[in-house]
Regions:
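Short, compositionally biased leader-like segments
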Residues: 1-12
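Active-site- and interface-proximal helix/loop "cap" or "latch" segments in soluble metabolic
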Residues: 14-15, 19-31, 36-107
Length: 107
């Protein structure tokens, strides 16, 4: 059996009212495949309503190491993503980082 060197984690946050995604989801979720050794985000996805938005957020997050903290990915996200879900995305990222820290403490 080949060892899997990644983790799959998720962060959640409430969506603001009036968002298209709010009609489908009550919360916004960011999921990420993380390299176990270095904490690097290899792939990320979120529950924004449009594929374009999901792809854009994924491209912004890819390559950051959660071992370095979550401040820089949040700063980059807030600088480049100007949609109504910006605060929810930042909160979901903080929750994702919290999940990572919790899992890291168990391994």
């Amino acid at each position: 059996m080949i060892p899997i060197n990644t983790l799959f984690i998720a962060g959640h946050a409430k969506l603001p009212t009036g968002m298209a995604a709010k009609n489908v989801y009550d919360s916004l979720t960011i999921t990420a495949e993380i390299d176990k050794k270095y904490g690097v985000i290899l792939e990320a996805s979120c529950t924004l309503a449009t594929e374009h938005g999901r792809d854009y957020v994924s491209s912004l997050l890819r390559g950051f190491s959660l071992q370095d903290g979550i401040e820089e990915p949040i700063r980059v996200l807030q600088h480049h993503y100007r949609g109504r879900a910006a605060n929810a995305l930042a909160a979901a990222l903080k929750d994702l980082h919290l999940q990572y820290e919790h899992l890291k403490g168990k391994t």
